[in-house]
């Protein structure tokens, strides 16, 4: 294992009376691109991107793409569709590379983009047209003189940290809300060097798996590192030799539970279809069928006002908590991974053990949650929130994945370039697996 991988391996994140979690030196991060957005003329120095000056000096690249158009400013958001057309962008700068997207993975944020919820990303970026798609594998073409992370001919994953803060953590996501970024749904694109992590030469795994890995499993890596480190600050390995880790959610949750399993935890995931329960079990994770408590969907506006709803919800919550007690021998859950949000948050907190951690990097079904701070303080519950990762975490995750086979089982069907609209329809209708992939170039 490389030094970087060792530094970031979740089992290396230890907290004792004499030492805290490992720190990442700032020098590990590509500079200065990681701390600025594309086309950001407000940042001085080598990372500066001056739109006017650049457009006069650069030649434009024209490519075929599936393009998202801006909605009408000031109007209510209306769902739209992508348009297949020619898209144009400037030649790569000195810290950028021209790339050919090969395989992409459909992500939830792509659905949010065409639904224009919670934002119209075109209007938010101040751009009439945007190319989305922020998970996948590319072939690296011409590289700028200052690029050090990849070389021409490399196969690399897209690392979708589009604009980072001073410590390298993302503020905006590439091919979503990061200004000027051009995503995977184009025959050619331009990536900054800190959006590219080269794959191991002669990798044992398919490009489809790496495409599915690039966003979800790196998200899982960063979230698990902090959640597990937080738990170990509360309870060391003598106090709690085998933590009980549960998860709501899909692919990211499954990836995170894979890390928990590798760290020696007892792992459980909740899902609601036969095929997904089978996939979970095949990964060595205990599956729990959510259909046993199908009415576990908390709605504060209906609770205690709608008698039938309240009765059904209360019964479902009771069934769920009984299931947790049975599987954990009454000890409850030490880390609960919750990528669902408001509908299950009440039940999640009730299932959490003392000194427990509830952790998330998403908000699939509700961004606003309520809790009683006094109760959480007394129980010493810790709430972890992360958003994707910083570059050195991505590098470590790739190294660990290659060494230990920690990659997702990508869907068997690969959508073709002409089938992109069908992919979006199938995804929105729930007719895909957790890792639907599509091909852009051969």
Residue map of PLM features:
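C-terminal hydrophobic helical "lid"/dimerization subdomain
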Residues: 61, 346-349, 391-442
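Conserved "cap/hinge" positions at secondary-structure junctions
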Residues: 144, 160-161, 249, 271, ...
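Adenosine-nucleotide cofactor-binding segment
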Residues: 241-243, 262-343
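Helix-to-beta-strand junctions that scaffold the AdoMet/dcAdoMet cofactor pocket
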Residues: 352-353
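Glycine-rich beta-strand-centered segment in the early N-terminal region that forms part
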Residues: 89-106, 117-166, 180-183
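NAD(P)H dinucleotide-binding glycine-rich loop of Rossmann-like/cofactor-binding domains
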Residues: 160-247, 293-304
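Hydrophobic/small residue at the entry helix of a nucleotide-binding pocket
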Residues: 251-252, 343
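Rossmann-fold dehydrogenase core element
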Residues: 289-291, 356-361, 371-409
């Amino acid at each position: 294992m490389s030094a970087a991988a060792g530094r970031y391996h979740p089992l290396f994140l230890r907290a004792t009376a004499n030492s805290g979690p490992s720190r990442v030196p700032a020098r590990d991060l590509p500079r200065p691109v990681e701390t600025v957005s594309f086309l950001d003329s407000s940042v001085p120095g080598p990372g500066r991107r001056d739109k006017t000056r650049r457009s006069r000096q650069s030649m434009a690249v024209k490519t075929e793409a599936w393009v998202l158009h801006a909605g009408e400013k000031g109007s209510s958001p209306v769902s739209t569709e992508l348009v297949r057309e020619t898209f144009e962008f400037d030649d790569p700068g000195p810290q950028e590379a021209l790339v050919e997207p090969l395989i992409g993975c459909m992500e939830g944020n792509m659905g949010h983009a065409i639904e224009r919820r919670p934002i119209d990303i075109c209007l938010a970026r101040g751009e009439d047209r945007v190319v989305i798609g922020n998970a996948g594998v590319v072939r690296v073409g011409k590289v700028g003189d200052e690029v050090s992370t990849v070389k021409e001919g490399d196969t690399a994953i897209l690392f979708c940290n589009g604009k980072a803060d001073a410590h390298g953590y993302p503020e905006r996501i590439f091919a979503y809300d990061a200004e000027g970024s051009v995503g995977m749904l184009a025959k050619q694109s331009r990536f900054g060097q800190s959006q590219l992590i080269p794959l191991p030469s002669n990798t044992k795994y398919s490009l489809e798996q790496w495409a599915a890995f690039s966003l979800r499993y790196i998200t899982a890596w960063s979230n698990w590192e902090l959640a597990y480190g937080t738990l170990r600050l509360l309870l060391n390995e003598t106090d709690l030799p085998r933590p009980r880790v549960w998860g709501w959610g899909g692919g990211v949750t499954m990836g995170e539970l894979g890390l928990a399993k590798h760290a020696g935890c007892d792992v459980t995931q909740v899902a609601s279809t036969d095929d997904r329960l089978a996939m979970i079990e095949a990964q060595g994770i205990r599956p729990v069928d959510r259909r046993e408590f199908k009415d576990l969907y908390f709605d504060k506006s209906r609770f205690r006002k709608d008698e039938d709803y309240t009765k059904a919800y209360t019964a479902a919550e009771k069934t769920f908590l009984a299931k947790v007690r049975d599987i954990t021998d009454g000890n409850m859950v030490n880390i609960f991974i919750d990528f669902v949000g408001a509908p299950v948050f009440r039940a999640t907190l009730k299932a959490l053990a003392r000194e427990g951690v509830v952790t998330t990097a998403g908000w699939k079904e509700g961004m606003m949650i309520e809790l009683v701070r006094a109760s959480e303080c007394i129980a010493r519950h810790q709430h972890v929130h992360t958003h994707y990762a910083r570059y050195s975490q991505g590098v470590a995750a790739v190294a660990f994945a290659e060494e230990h086979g920690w990659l997702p089982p990508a869907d068997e069907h690969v959508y073709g370039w002409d089938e992109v609209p069908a992919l979006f329809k199938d995804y929105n209708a729930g007719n895909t697996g957790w890792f639907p992939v599509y091909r852009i170039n051969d």
